[in-house]
């Protein structure tokens, strides 16, 4: 038996060899990975990282803001979807990193804790959202963080909010490549009916404006400044519906690239670079990608 496979299994993880990541990303693109590792709890995640100390690995939440190369990757991917426990402590909530944001929002609604309604419908995990400081409709997840537990140099440590930097789609965790395991978040009491109404309103807006019927990796580009709307800029260039191979600029929202059924990593990357070039020519603005890209087993 493969020694790394055996050690990961003994560490309390389920392990799949040569698993296609296209089955684990929302855009349905991605080659085979040598080890797909599913830790069953925070402790098995810790042990898995120890096993992989001399083998390259990446952390994956729900794969919703991720673009992965088509070629096989000689790495391990630790997918945190089973780290999904939520514990309420008054007006504070302790939540594990693999918890889907939607599930956390529904939990908060039942507990009558308000504030995170804007995140209902964002399809990622709590850990991924904290990592990139996800936000929508004027809210960002970093506003609700009291402390975050991370794995750093083989040790579990808690960082308080005063030790954490949050910026626009940016954070300490992203800059320092820290592995998020749990977060303590703080909310305010709110009536269930009010929370539900807000969540339904945000979801209605998403359904109206975003291409939720086709595979995508979410919003592709960061907004370069507050008054520059990327989707509108791309639309003004007449690029809605423009496609390269199976990758297409969404006809519903030009800030999204969708997989029409046969898109490859190269199709999407070429389309990203084409859009960046056209926006630079017209507006003099350099677009940065919001989507995380794995190429040659590393973040691009």
From Swiss-Prot:
Belongs to the MurB family. The active site is at residues 169, 219, 290. Residues 28-190 form the FAD-binding PCMH-type domain. The keyword Flavoprotein applies. GO terms for biological process: cell division; cell wall organization; peptidoglycan biosynthetic process; regulation of cell shape. The gene is murB. GO terms for cellular component: cytosol. It is found in: Cytoplasm. It comes from Thermotoga sp. (strain RQ2). Pathway: Cell wall biogenesis; peptidoglycan biosynthesis. Keywords: Cell cycle, Cell division, Cell shape, Cell wall biogenesis/degradation, Cytoplasm, FAD, Flavoprotein, NADP, Oxidoreductase, Peptidoglycan synthesis. It catalyses: UDP-N-acetyl-alpha-D-muramate + NADP(+) = UDP-N-acetyl-3-O-(1-carboxyvinyl)-alpha-D-glucosamine + NADPH + H(+). GO terms for molecular function: FAD binding; UDP-N-acetylmuramate dehydrogenase activity. Its EC number is 1.3.1.98. Its cofactor is FAD. InterPro entries: FAD-bd_PCMH, FAD-bd_PCMH-like_sf, FAD-bd_PCMH_sub1, FAD-bd_PCMH_sub2, MurB, MurB_C, MurB_C_sf, Oxid_FAD_bind_N. This is UDP-N-acetylenolpyruvoylglucosamine reductase. PANTHER family: UDP-N-ACETYLENOLPYRUVOYLGLUCOSAMINE REDUCTASE. Its main location: cytoplasm. Coiled coil: none annotated. Cell wall formation.
């Amino acid at each position: 038996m493969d020694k790394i496979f055996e050690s990961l299994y003994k560490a309390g993880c389920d392990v799949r060899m040569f698993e296609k990541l296209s089955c684990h990303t929302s855009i349905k693109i991605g080659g085979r990975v040598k080890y797909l590792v599913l830790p069953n709890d925070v402790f098995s995640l810790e042990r898995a990282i120890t096993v992989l100390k001399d083998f390259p690995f990446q952390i994956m939440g729900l794969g919703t803001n991720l673009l992965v190369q088509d070629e096989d990757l000689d790495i391990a991917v630790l997918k945190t979807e089973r780290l999904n426990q939520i514990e309420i402590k008054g007006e504070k909530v302790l939540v594990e990193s693999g918890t889907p944001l939607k599930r956390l929002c529904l939990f908060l609604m039942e507990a009558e804790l308000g504030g995170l309604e804007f995140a209902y419908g964002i399809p990622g995990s709590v850990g991924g959202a904290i990592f990139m400081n996800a936000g929508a409709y004027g809210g960002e997840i970093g506003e609700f963080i009291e402390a975050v537990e991370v794995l750093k140099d083989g040790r579990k440590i808690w960082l308080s909010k005063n030790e954490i930097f949050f910026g626009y789609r940016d954070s300490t965790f992203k800059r320092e490549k820290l592995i998020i395991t749990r977060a303590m978040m703080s909310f305010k009491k709110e009536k269930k009916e009010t929370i539900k109404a807000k969540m339904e309103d945000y979801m209605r807006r998403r359904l109206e404006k975003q291409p939720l019927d086709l595979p995508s990796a979410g919003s592709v580009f960061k907004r370069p400044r507050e008054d520059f709307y990327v989707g509108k800029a791309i639309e003004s260039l007449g690029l809605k519906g423009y496609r390269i191979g199976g990758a297409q600029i969404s006809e519903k929202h030009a800030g999204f690239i969708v997989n029409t059924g046969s898109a490859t990593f190269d199709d999407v990357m070429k389309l990203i670079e084409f859009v960046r070039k056209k926006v630079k020519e017209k507006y003099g603005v350099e677009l940065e990608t919001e989507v995380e890209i794995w190429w040659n087993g590393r973040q691009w």
